Amino acid sequence: MSDISRRDFLKTGAMALAGITIAPSSILGMSHGHVSPSDKLNIAAVGIGGMGHANINKVKGTENIVALCDVDWKYAKRVFDEFPKAKKYWDYRKMYEEMGKSIDGVIIATADHTHAIITADAMTMGKHVFCQKPLTHSVYESRLLTKLAASTGVATQMGNQGASDEGTDLVCEWIWNGEIGEVTKVECATDRPIW
């Protein structure tokens, strides 16, 4: 699996917010591939096993993983071990309370029925959110999150790899533009089980 660049991460989705630059990029050698620590986002993750771990790996190395939260520490141990500097939590509310001022964005990959409330709490704090599907379980929850996004101005994305993956977009463009001719057969592979 190849690493995703910061540009691709912001474009395809996880979260978007430019940090305040303390030192000019030219001084830090940005043209040579170096990134100022102040240009990195501070990311927290809730639900870090399975898809949560996969989502964290998409930003590992390009962003700062500062806090991790999971109710099953036995299952989450491998991720905790991978990010020893990140603060560890059982309860996302405690993580938000203690780390809120230092978090730029949150990755949410918990049990489906908890997505909306964890997302709403993060958005209310002004945090950018990448949340796994399904984002909500009701029209009410969807409307609430839509209003929160509008009122807070945060960037949000729901993870739907089948529709939001950069490769999927590229192939669709090729087909729509007639660049590869008529498609008569498609073969797919999957990395299951990822959980």
Question: What are these language model-derived features?
Answer:
Residues G13-F83, G162-D165:
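N-terminal Rossmann-like dinucleotide-binding module
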